[in-house]
Amino acid sequence: GLQQLALSNCKQNPKLTFWGNIRFEKTFTRDLADLLSYGGLTAVSAGIEIATGSGLSTINKGTEIEHIIAACCAFKEAGILIHSYMIFGFWNQTPQDLINSMETLRQMFQEGLLDSAFWHKFTLTKHSTVYKEWEQGKHPDLKPIPQSPTQFAQNNISFEGEEKSQKYSDPLNAALNQ
């Protein structure tokens, strides 16, 4: 993907610059980040979602906080800007989970590992991994609210307790602007 684009772009005159949408994975080493930067990558966007080890495990993110931080270090050392998507309001998220996630995010900003971030509210959808896992008996604490059979093309599914996290929306986004 990005590596092939960067290599191909190196042959262009003039080279294009581009922004990539990625997953923070351990494959993003300093050498790869340097190559991507030389090949025109100026910034990346990626979802951290929950900046805690237990949170990443719960949502089956497929990566660990250590890999996310290592990838961010590699990108920043290569001069690449980083934007992260954060998510709050998971069905099983406690206020302490949210505080821990915000603290990790604060530390990442303090260390210069992130340039920007935005908090999004979790939305359960019919085709999401979480919903499919719930159908298989996983996530017994998730309680989807049955939809009306007449709802056409409605992908979002409400769940019990989702409104309890709404009170965090404004404070989380305000904290990013400090």
Q: Where is each model-derived feature located?
A:
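Non-membrane alpha-helical structural segments and their capping/turn regions in soluble enzymes
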Residues: 62-69, 95-102, 170
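Conserved SAM/AdoMet-binding glycine-rich loop
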Residues: 1-81
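A structural motif corresponding to the C-terminal end of an alpha-helix
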Residues: 12, 39, 70-82, 108-114, ...
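C-terminal structural cap/anchor segments
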Residues: 71, 75-76, 82-87, 96-104
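Acidic/polar loop patches that form or flank catalytic/metal-binding clefts of enzymes
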Residues: 17-20, 83, 112-119
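Catalytic cores of alpha/beta
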Residues: 31-34, 91-108
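Conserved, mostly hydrophobic/aromatic
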Residues: 46, 84, 105, 117
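Flexible glycine/acidic-rich beta-alpha junction loops that bind and position SAM and/or redox cofactors
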Residues: 54-59, 88-96, 112-170
